[in-house]
Amino acid sequence: MKMETTNIAKNDTLKKVIDTYCKMKDSGVLQEVNNWDEYTGSMLNSEVAGVINGCWIMGTMQTAEDQSGKWAITNIPKLTNVKGATNYSNIGGSSWAISGNCGNVELAEDFLASTFAGSTELYDNILSCGAIATWTPAGDSDAYAVPNEFFSGDAVFEKIVDYSTKVPSIITGPYFHEARDAISVATTNITNGADLEKELKKAEDTVNFNMGQ
């Protein structure tokens, strides 16, 4: 979505994504689960050989101490013959915003600029709590270069920040989650045998309805 318009029903790239997803599922390469417990269990119980997710999933993975040295961090596969496709993406994370009701916007801006957008020391201190920054200067910190024993001594935090500099920027818009949910429903139906074109048209109609169009 961009500028509150939908691009679902005739989105050829999205169709390739869903087609690839279906092929992975049908071949057995992709394991589907029904809930979060099954998802984390598939990692902790050695049921899967890899996981495509944001860096925040590392905390869950490292609770399985018996798997230390068996996991690694790398980039992701990309679609071929798709303009702009890369081996880098993101999912989740947090955002900082200043409310329109803020009593001192200038002070709030200065605070954010001096801390989360200006202090590598802050990120060094909170790294041990599992808070990983994708703020580029943080990647130059000595703390981010420390080897991680669970991941075979790899400096995974430094690697993640480097990856983050290569993630394409997108404009999600205020109806991003509505679009995501509609496409998720469509994808589930398609993997179960529903017609791709009809499901994507239905998803687009759903989002347009939510946007009042």
Language-model regions, residue ranges each:
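Short, hydrophobic secondary-structure boundary micro-motifs
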Residues: 1-7, 31-34, 123-126, 198-200
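Glycine-centered hinge/linker elements that transmit conformational signals in sensory
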Residues: 3-33
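Non-transmembrane alpha-helical segments in soluble domains
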Residues: 18-25, 40, 44, 99, ...
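Conserved C-terminal helix/tail region of periplasmic/extracytoplasmic solute-binding proteins
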Residues: 23-26, 142, 159-213
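Conserved hydrophobic residue
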Residues: 30, 48, 195-196
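Short helix-initiation/N-cap motifs at beta->coil->alpha
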Residues: 31-45
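Alpha-to-beta junction loops
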Residues: 45-54, 69
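C-terminal lobe and pocket-closing loops
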Residues: 57-68, 80-182
